[in-house]
């Protein structure tokens, strides 16, 4: 937290008018508590998306409205295996948390990305029940007039043939997510630079000269699953790409899984594969802004890399979001040979308050999602928003940020009055710098009247 003291010049005054705005927001966004969703109600919601078997309907009727029948969410598979739907157990989470028009959802066999989201839904439900969180109804209602159908056509995974040139059992979820995005763009034709590092588990060195790699996009298939019979050239093409992405992002391989950090993938895209990229986190941007960024990228025709980590567990999963529907649910491609690919809710993981049990603090699952925005440098796509790039130095408040006028009454004060201002929870999203942070005071005409610096300005700031 920074404390700032300043005195305004004679003849200048500052009045912050906010009461009217606050009153209007209260009028249109009334906070209310959600209602439990029972199996019988959940079935009625599910019927709008899929065809249910008679047994499922009968079971729901039998459970009735007993409290013991309540659940954080209800999973229903289509009677003909033509999709599934996940219905929320509390209507403050929305009606539907996920749905697909193909395949089924088996929680025992679900990929890590699906399990991560389902666990996050469970945590959200628990917070709603234990903390009695108030949710803004207005914020979660309304339809989107523009939608984006899934951009990716690929259904890639981590085993054969994707791991064929890595020398290890799994290519890694980070490499699979990035490679699928690159396949969508068919870029670049050739890599650049080199990388070498140690694979810790095996205590061996792994390296690659990307300038020697020519990516055969035309020979890569969108789907290598049975009954597809790929040629050796088609398998080699995707295996080379997957290995290069893994090496460029310092992939750590083990017999049971392979993983790395998204920040390394972000750097690799720029350094080795000729992309402009931005690393964006939900914790810094805030849930509403984060979702807006994702939607705009998708509207621009650009899929987005996502990475999530469950609370209390360092191991996460990386995948791609490549579309969204009229209700704001995002389509996820989990890089698991198509398994679990569907529309999922991200917004219900965003709670503005968490109740007295959690001292009103955002929980881990609200902060644990980050994104990589990546655009090929081929001139075919709109530029990434400049303010999101690391090359655009800027300070910004994160979701808990605030500016407080400590000593002012009624948000106004005399021009000659010395005033203490406190700012907290802001971050530097750009390059590191050494300096100071100040506050500028503008009059009603937009003229800068005075600039005030921190108490430590005389000794060099921070």
Question: What residue ranges belong to the model's regions?
Answer:
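Short, compositionally biased P/S/T/A/G/V-rich stretches that sit at domain boundaries
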Residues: 355-420, 443-447
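Bacterial N-terminal signal peptides
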Residues: 15-28
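Autoinhibitory propeptides
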Residues: 72-140
